[in-house]
Design a protein with these regions (language model features):
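Alpha/beta-hydrolase active-site loop
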Residues: 26, 47-65
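Glycine-rich phosphate-binding loop signature in dinucleotide/nucleotide-binding domains
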Residues: 9, 63-68, 150
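Aromatic pocket-lining residues of Rossmann-like dinucleotide-binding sites
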Residues: 85-86
Length: 199
């Protein structure tokens, strides 16, 4: 992120944190629907949670020197990284799209899909899967050792057919946090069709 990338239209900015395979330029798509905010997207190292946390905190700290109101817009696993990185920072509000809210549950689900037990994962350290993810025991331990305490007012956009976060998981999160849930019927985890994007 460079200083020239940050417009100074107001004292309010949204920090956009993309999901897996995304990039900072996705933030551009939100400018027309959120004209009262400056919006900046960041790219970050998503290879391990602590690396993502470091990069997101650095971006936040830079913005905090120039903006008095920082909100967060995050997508998919970007939501997990945002909450991990910014739970101790002053965030005005958050909007999470198809968020990964319980990363430990997702990892355990992926282990089940791959037919991998925790004992096997611990012994081997890392195991590639047929669905494109590499299971990591170190990653799982980090998640367990670094719980999140999220108190930011949060809006969640959830797709009815999300295959990564269950409806039960999102409803449990909403009931125990200062959060509001909007569900798109027949939506998928990846909001990509015209109908889904317009929603």
């Amino acid at each position: 992120m460079k200083a020239k990338d940050i417009a100074m239209a107001s004292d309010k900015i949204i920090l956009y944190i993309h999901g897996k395979g995304g990039n900072a330029t996705e933030a551009d798509g939100y400018r027309s629907i959120l004209p009262e905010y400056d919006i900046i997207g960041i790219d970050y190292d998503d290879s391990f949670p602590s690396a993502a946390k470091r990069d997101i905190q650095a971006a936040y700290d830079k913005l905090a020197r120039r903006y008095s109101h920082i909100s967060v817009l995050a997508n998919s696993i970007g939501a997990y990284f945002a909450m991990l990185a910014l739970q101790d920072r002053k965030v005005s509000k958050a909007a999470l799209i198809s968020p990964i809210l319980d990363i430990e549950r997702l990892i355990c689900d992926m282990m089940l899909w791959a037919g991998v037990t925790e004992e096997i994962l611990e012994k081997q350290g890392g195991i590639p899967t047929t669905f494109g993810e590499t299971l990591s025991y170190k990653y799982l331990c980090y998640v367990r050792d670094n719980p999140i305490c999220w108190t930011v007012p949060t809006e969640i956009l959830y797709a009815e057919k999300d295959n990564l976060t269950s409806r039960n998981t999102v409803e449990q999160f909403v009931s125990s946090h200062n959060a509001h849930l909007t569900v798109m019927e027949n939506g998928e985890h990846w909001f990509h069709t015209d109908e889904q994007l317009n929603f």
